[in-house]
Each structure stands twice: as C-alpha cells, then as structure tokens.
Amino acid sequence: MQSMKDAAASAKAGMEKAKASMQEKVDQMKTRDPNEKEMARERKEERQEDAELRKQEARHHNATAGHVGGGGIGGTGYTTAGYNIGDTGGYGGTGGHDNRGYPTAGSGYDTGRQDDLSSMGFGGDTEGAYGTTGNQDFPNAASNNAGTRRNTRGGTQDDPYYRSY
C-alpha cells in the first residue's frame, strides 16, 4: 500500500513538473523581453522544487502513517478522527498536523513554508481532501457545475449528444 501511495506521489509530482515546464515555454513564447523569460524560468524552477518537496512530504507521511498510532492494550492506535496523538509510538510527540494531515512535530516539516499555491494553476487546492457527499470528482466538496455534465438519466430526448441514426 505504501509503495502504491509513493508511486502516486511521484506521478503527481512528475505531472506538476511537466506542467511547470510547459507553462514556462508558453510564457517564453509570449514575450521577447529577456527579463520576462528569466522570470518564467525561475517560476518553473520554483514550481518544480515545490512539487519535489510535496512528493518527499507525501513519502515521509506514507512511511510514518502506519507507525503513528502504536496502539495500546487491545487497540490499534487509530481513530475515526485521524491520528491518535496520545500514543504516538515515538512519532510526532505532542505536536499537531498541518492542513494536509502531515505531522508538524518531529518530522522536519518546515513550518515557515508558504502554502499559497494559488499561482500554481490548479486552483490553489492545498487541502488534498475530497468530499463524501456525492461529488467526489470535485476537490474539497466544491459544488459541481451540473450544466457542464452530460445528463444520461433524462432519456435520449434530453441528451444533447444523442444522435438518432
């Protein structure tokens, strides 16, 4: 399970790095100013470093997630609310977790890091959580735009993509 999560984190980081490279190329094509081209390169490098940092954080989180609970007598150490901080098994101490669920104490997590990712091009979604109210396709349980979805329940007369041959 951990290796699958690590592979997913690597794939996501790879996609973010590729996206940063493509955005740099677009920005460089749009301008002739060498300063703007240099700024585009710097933005790309910053985005790639941020993607690598998030990948490493996810790997660290995946490696410690199974050890955080520790469990007491007759317990697993896990609760429905997340981590059981009372019995940390040597991980995390009495610290909390950041907004993505990563431990902030004893993990080497940089608490001074800026998490303003609104300029990354993916809406600034830093929560990493999905709602469970029937709209799992949308980050943070954002309301879906029903007008852009294909309606297959109303029959063929309501389906704008239906073609009768």
From Swiss-Prot:
Compositionally biased region (Low complexity): 1-13
Compositional bias of kind Polar residues: 132-155
Annotated region described as Disordered, given as residue ranges: 1-76, 92-165
A Pfam entry, by short name: LEA_1
InterPro entries per record: LEA_1
BP terms from Gene Ontology: embryo development ending in seed dormancy; response to abscisic acid; response to cold; response to salt stress; response to water deprivation
Biased composition (Basic and acidic residues): 14-60
Start-end of Gly residues biased regions: 67-76
Family under the similarity heading: Belongs to the LEA type 1 family.
Note: This is a SET 5a protein.
Annotated function: LEA proteins are late embryonic proteins abundant in higher plant seed embryos. There are two subsets of LEA proteins (5a and 5b), the first ones are expressed when the cotyledon weight reach 80 mg and the second set are expressed above 100 mg. The function of those proteins is not known.
Protein name as catalogued: Late embryogenesis abundant protein D-113
Native species: Gossypium hirsutum (Upland cotton)
